[in-house]
Swiss-Prot record:
Listed Pfam families: Pkinase
Active site: 128
Main location: cytoplasm
Function: Casein kinases are operationally defined by their preferential utilization of acidic proteins such as caseins as substrates. It can phosphorylate a large number of proteins.
Tissues in which the UniProt entry reports expression: Expressed in flowers.
Alphabetic keyword roster: ATP-binding, Cell junction, Cytoplasm, Kinase, Nucleotide-binding, Phosphoprotein, Serine/threonine-protein kinase, Transferase
Record-given protein name: Casein kinase 1-like protein 1
Organism: Arabidopsis thaliana (Mouse-ear cress)
Entry-linked PANTHER family: CASEIN KINASE-RELATED
Catalytic activity reported: L-seryl-[protein] + ATP = O-phospho-L-seryl-[protein] + ADP + H(+); L-threonyl-[protein] + ATP = O-phospho-L-threonyl-[protein] + ADP + H(+)
Amino acid sequence: MEPRVGNKFRLGRKIGSGSFGEIYLGTNIHTNEELAIKLENVKTKHPQLLYESKLYRILQGGTGVPNVKWFGVEGDYNVLVMDLLGPSLEDLFNFCSRKLSLKSVLMLADQMINRVEFFHSKSFLHRDLKPDNFLMGLGRRANQVYIIDFGLAKKYRDSTTHQHIPYRENKNLTGTARYASMNTHLGIEQSRRDDLESLGYILMYFLKGSLPWQGLKAGTKKQKYERISEKKVSTSIEALCRGYPSEFASYFHYCRSLRFDDKPDYAYLKRIFRDLFIREGFQFDYVFDWTILKYQQSQLTAPPSRALNPAVGTSAALPPGISNIDRYTGEEEGRPHMESSRRRVSGALDNSGNISNQPTSSSARDSMIPSSSLFAQSAGSSRRVTAVSGSRDNFPGSEELLQRSRTGDVSRGVIPRNSPGEAGKSTRRHYESVVKGIDNLQVSDEHHPH
């Protein structure tokens, strides 16, 4: 007899595991919808699934928050049934040879700030923001960023009175040392400013490929955290952001200027990145680096490459051959008091090269390759010519930004325009031929629940 949980969910193959238990692919026996099922032994030393399920319930309905289908106890296990999601940003970062373009980073930043703002609006801090804890959706939501893993979240204010928790010092490090804020390293109680600083480190990690305090050697875990802290404190914002647009330094300066109980101006942070996005001449079309790479691979292989494996409320897709040391065990830069709640299973997608610094030249469909969104590159130019897909993730501000990018209505500067000429004509001819050729492009939906 096939194993079931909650009398309506079929337990399938294991797709991941972690210190808290196992992650399985599940199916709703009534609708045949694929889901993620987390199992945690009721006798585990640090139970977190019940707490996490309560937070998911509080956050239900928010954009980019996985839906919880069921929580309960089956035999010796706590069980959480929730949406099946796509690969994590760490997976996709690895897939793109560990570097993302400015365009991709800015499109992600807009959604990620929104997710953190929503989390804070519900009176909670995440306290463990990292690329592994942001996942992309599947199917029609493949361009939407989801936030997951609330095991270390903490309520920072009273939900009714909004009375903030008191300032405290001598706190142990909670979260992942690589992305922890300076104040967290210094033992100061975390607040909203610290989540945002962690997000800034994630963005620089995507742009640079690594952070200055990675790869430091030490004898013990405690010494490791101390070395990371020393390096982080000694690395100025200007040094960290050198070679990249000044908006990133402005982001960090703003985060570090906040007092302990200040409410951040999330709109300001989104605005500086949106204005940069417009000045660069980008189109808000949801064509990410991995979208282009996946399309390029589909053109080079027959049959086309399979999509990245779907994941659970924790990600389960990782292209083979990619080493990502100490992302889960905590031995390198993980959690000092609680092991990460995930391990990853291999995906099936190979990466043939890093396209982060290459001009974009192809297109994509909604799941990974939107058929009506593509780039056409003119000779010697990195300017984009884009037909924008009508099926977008409607997170706040995207339509406004798209309209501004079309009209050039920007508060800080004007988009430079290429002069017409043979290069432009060549671009248009190439664009038209690609549009004709891509109309019939089919991508397998075998892993998509929708």
